[in-house]
Amino acid sequence: MRLSVFIANTVSTQLVIDLQKIYASYFPEASLTEQALTELITQSSSRLYMTMFNERHIGAVNVQINATQATLSQLTIRDLTRRRGVGKNLLKQLEKSLTAEGMTDIEYNLKEVAEVELLATQAFLSDSGYQLNNHIATKKLL
């Protein structure tokens, strides 16, 4: 089965369980409750893009749109599935979707990334075509 990418806009028990696993090392425990994750999924100011494999959600990124710029946050892939192209596929599909909507720029503030993850995240984003400058990763969409 292939990877799929979609915007999570409907809360399900499985989605909440999977988000708790995806964000276990990212959010404090208080942010992993069903209520907190439901708010993350349903907030109107942003979209939660998910990647799925074999009926399990294995990665997520939050996206805020402002005119022609998209701002990424909370990008993470479940530990067990890292380094297998899941994150690259998520970004590729996300960028394709945003380009179709008329977005021209993407940025990600790396100050939110845990220090132990920073070098790997910088390398991942650089390898995905992002320019790094003072904790901000940017990419022009074509």
Model-identified regions with their sequence ranges:
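Active-site rim helix/loop that mediates acceptor-substrate recognition in acyltransferases
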Residues: F27-M52
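Conserved GNAT acetyl-CoA-binding A-motif
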Residues: L98-V113
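Alpha-helical elements of Rossmann-like donor-binding domains used by nucleotide-donor carbohydrate transfer enzymes
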Residues: D18-I22, A36, N89, Q93, ...
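Short amphipathic alpha-helix that is part of the acyltransferase structural core
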Residues: M1-L32
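Conserved catalytic-core motifs of GNAT/GCN5-like acyltransferases
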Residues: N109-V116, Q122, S126-L142
